[in-house]
């Protein structure tokens, strides 16, 4: 590729020269814009010239994929990419990016989002965009705490991390430490400090991914750490709950409840994995019903809140039984939905071969 540096020549002339020098398609971006990284990748995969646009008038932002064959149609006196895009569109030398072909579904967020590109002209616009991108990075299907309780805590933490350059992997490592620090505390019956660590980890689990996506520092190791933590830690928590309640052998019903809770949890993760392979995406993003049910099913934030409420009521034992039953019902629900959507539904609801 070629980077167009500020020089005495007008943008149009410099862009022409860059295209001729490149000898192949170039993705042309305005460094003053905030651009969806998915859009950059998608433009780089195009075989012909096209333009992506968002906004109107002075707030209109454009990004282009240009083939050297259109260089002669670029106005030599063009001063910005908007003028370049307008001229090329007027002559029919470029087409508008096909929105239907853009991969809008984001697996990590379990939702579809159109591509975004913004012109950042002042501090007020920047603050508005920060808030909008923050909400855009919330999962389409998630639990009640993550959706309604955590945002007032997560938003200032995300801003702090982005402003001071704290890498999301650092946030993930702190959350891992908190997640496993809760285990011996609970096992020792120190419920308060155990839940302080657990809820701290839960909040940070909403922070690291957003920092990564907002600062474009998403990494494979970060994803492995984040998703690995999400899947691995719950069984340790559940076993620690039983120990904290004084259950130390299979002769104790609470001990067996914890064992069954772990079995149900592992089986549930297996079922969800099968569902994703069959459907082609996360089960919870399949239908509005699945999205709504995701807010209350037996996942970490819901189960630990049930347990915390039970302990506050002086009913830790019944609380563990309730959590086990809820995890079992969740497994049955996911099994039924996987059977229907993945195996019994009409052909068009199954993933493409």
Language model segments and positions:
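A feature for the membrane-embedded catalytic helix bundles of lipid/isoprenoid biosynthetic enzymes
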Residues: 58-158, 227-353
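Conserved small-residue-rich
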Residues: 139-185
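Extended, compositionally biased accessory segments flanking or bridging domains
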Residues: 1-2
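Conserved beta-loop-beta/alpha segment of the NTase-like Rossmann-fold superfamily
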Residues: 6-66
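Short amphipathic alpha-helical coupling elements at transmembrane boundaries
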Residues: 155-162, 209, 213, 223, ...
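Membrane-embedded alpha-helical segments that form the functional core of polytopic membrane enzymes
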Residues: 168-221
